[in-house]
């Protein structure tokens, strides 16, 4: 059942091209609403929720052809309101050609304010209201107000203006829909948030207000598969138990739609999947008839239930214990692998390890992952667990063990300083790894005071930036420049660089410098370990008088020290080989990070630029990915420094369709080799497959103040009174750091320092 609004273009899919809306052109519409219950014999025949006024759907507004025959002057006026032709509107009103309170057509009384509202023409709306236009005038087949018409398209700025000038949010149209219902139906999360904070939070509308069919806004959002709106409604306390006149709860309608994220939110909030409708069907029966079984099962398992809706047994009482087991598993697996390769035929070992890997994967998924704490809608997988950080820790631990018990005793007399250096590096790497795992990357606190959130929304509306790029819908704060929301930390991270699976944490403002120290020491430690192992293998060769067993057994290694290691201590040799393999991606990571620091950009900003160059999209078509409905001609005073950041983080128009990533591409990305290749291309100016010159893209980075300035900004804290060594080694103080040589607060960074201004009073 899809109501009259179902065929209206969603605010999230409107193109940036000028659009003049004439809903009279809707030839046919499937309407949302359940008709009489006797019309529905089974859910399999249920296509949509139908509205009560089926015969009026798609005919809400006047037909222009008929209107033109009746009154060409009125047609000209309404067309000007549609197109935002303020000059013509003013001319006609000031010239007394029309009266602002008598500007409706003769059939459905559609006013100029209605037309301006549904076409997002704020300047025309402002003028008409200033001339005394009735903001609560009813018109159209459903007798809707201009507020209703603006809300159905998700036009936040029009809704805000009308409410501030007397529009009544409690009024309903002939379908029984009020402002909250229509806002939810627009699927524009920004309008939903605006209404929740400025109308519902103030008690003007109940979060669970129903339409004539008994459906709440949560039920509508669940039916539409709008997970963003469902999440926000649940935060405001929307009831998951209220059923409509047919006995359908939000979970029932969510199952009809089959959107997994919606089902996850509802089930996590306590929705009853065993509850039955008036026809005696629960969610499992509905899923079978609507072919959404897979989505329901995914939501159930994600929320800790089996396919039949019963709790999955948890083998660990605490989530931390399960994560600890996942973290330790790679250490044991690597030890077994090295031991087997040391004593058994490699071909046989590969088969054994393959079977062991499958068994380990099955065991972790069945017995360990179910004990993880669930938060949000992201599936819990091994790649989203501490597994990869356990791989690194296991490698580090095995390197430490073989160095301490085997390598150091034989090489200390000849390589004292090298062994001491190895000890210092190992201690430092262990310490930094532990710190990076638990360290705050620069998380901004979420906002819980509704009054503060309302003020933030108001401020963003004033500057035309109330969208998901500037407002965090998860934490309800204004996003500072260069920040990003992290699902792992459930917070916005200042100067977000990237999520690193090897430390199971984000890298941001507060731990980025420590991360650079960490990977640099790691690479140094690997080559120090290599030098000691070569000395160790040489000692082994000297200890064995009979070296004939080396002949013909080392292949390409010849008679080198590495051959001695392979023959006399294969376990140490394999660990060294494994460590050297890690050094490849670590070296590429260091190279990429050094390049980005010199360019003055974060890893995330670099990724956005690279995705822009690889994007595939239809020519001339751009999608509103940020739910921005800023009216055309809206010209607030925006500082160039703030605006320039948009060129870095904003998606390129037409970039919503991208090349699919292969399995090899995923591995390539996890090790960071994809960025290494992109940096090489940028350095020598190679064009990508789409013909873009990567260098021409990165040259537009607004935070690039020259490589010397960028390096100083990264490595030096803003505390000019501290000694130089302290400024280099210590992380930023609180949320403050240098940018173009001046101190900025990254928690409140909404404007970038101007590149053209020479910083005379340098804080270096």
Curated annotation (Swiss-Prot):
**Subcellular location per the Swiss-Prot or TrEMBL entry:** Early endosome membrane; Golgi apparatus membrane
Compositional bias (Polar residues) at which positions? 10-27
Q: How does it sit in the membrane?
A: Multi-pass membrane protein
Q: Which residues lie on this side of the membrane: Cytoplasmic?
A: 1-321, 365-384, 440-513, 592-764
Residues modified as Phosphoserine are 51, 57
Q: What class of enzyme is it?
A: transferase
Keywords for the protein's UniProt record, in alphabetical order: Acyltransferase, ANK repeat, Endosome, Golgi apparatus, Lipoprotein, Membrane, Palmitate, Phosphoprotein, Repeat, Transferase, Transmembrane, Transmembrane helix
Name any Gene Ontology BP term.
Answer: protein palmitoylation
GO molecular function (one): palmitoyltransferase activity
Entries under SUPFAM superfamilies matching the protein = Ankyrin repeat
Q: What is known of its domains?
A: The DHHC domain is required for palmitoyltransferase activity.
- Further remark: Present with 4072 molecules/cell in log phase SD medium.
Name of this protein: Palmitoyltransferase AKR1
Q: Which species is listed as the source?
A: Saccharomyces cerevisiae (strain ATCC 204508 / S288c) (Baker's yeast)
Q: Which gene encodes it?
A: AKR1
